């Protein structure tokens, strides 16, 4: 297999377990480990995760330099907010290539990935070029090797005037939330078993699962009892149910929950124990709301503040770039993510967690959740200059008008204790403590 490219790129180095290979001028060849180590050390080379590549070759993780063109950084810049496993194979999968197996195939795939991503920048419309152009001059000054290649294809008129400031002031381009009139009291209509199983059938068809699943239908029917109107004030209906792995519990309770929310004009809170289960419920919600824009409004994930990007922390780190105490490239890639993220969740959302580990960057300079979320309870709320664009505040307000809110037990309990919220919260609890374990 050969590759033709009109971009002036260095050769691509792949070092999976079992061998090393280099793709140069469209053809790949095997390398010994010493040869690969020398090429990596001398550069320039294309790599996927410079830190891991160095460790496989027995070298120290390098500082960011023009010798190492990390295609993962290019991916984070061109396709912000999209998931990618941090390997050549991961890049190949997300870009639609055949998954490479050998080191030769991975080196070719890495070169193809860089070429495809750069070709996407050449096809951007003016709006996309302007959004990226705010950051590219600053990235070029910081020594990011892809910056000059991308800028070469940009008309000078598409580089915004504020690009000279580095473009890291991403808070200035975020939309603000607006207060809306409070909702009235929720309705009290119940959900019938027929409504729940009908909704379940719709969701299974959307998920491509057309076979009969009587156990899952029975679970969905049982869950409807949690939505019966209260007979006595402050005594909600409670259903304690258990089902084995593979039954399909998530869609089993999302089906009646979504019907209840639609009929009664109020959100249903689904509480779970772990972030992994929150992600799973959110993923399966794709069958409930296939359209991403509708899903963003109808299904909201709620977590504690320590999970979300704090714009004030980000601003403080961005100001450190001029002093040389912050990672300019990492912050620029984070700025791209801020413009594309669904909800600003850095710990389990769409933030590429591998960004801080690609190169040797001091911990206090990294664009990482450790530095960019509020872990010390120092939020000043309405006194913050970014209060109107705050991701947490947007999530709070979005949850009020959603149909399904996916939260964790800690947030739900604190929410109930301090705000006395009265909403229906079904939980998937295989033990009396209400904890979810799988």
State what each model feature region is.
Residues 2-3, 115-190:
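Acidic two-metal-ion nuclease catalytic site recognized across multiple nuclease folds
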Residues 62-79, 270-275, 294-311, 429-438:
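Conserved beta-strand -> loop -> alpha-helix junction used to position metal-binding or nucleic-acid-contacting
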Residues 190-201, 267, 272-403:
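A substrate-engagement module of RecA-like helicase motors
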Residues 386-396, 409-433:
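Conserved RecA-like ASCE ATPase "motif II neighborhood" in helicase/translocase motors
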Residues 224-228, 250-264, 284-288:
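Walker A/P-loop NTP-binding motif
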Residues 187-241:
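Conserved pre-motif I regulatory segment
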Residues 241-253:
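Glycine-rich P-loop/Walker A and Walker A-like loops and their local beta1-loop-alpha1 context
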Residues 9-121:
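Conserved DEDDh/DEDDy metal-dependent 3′-5′ exonuclease domain
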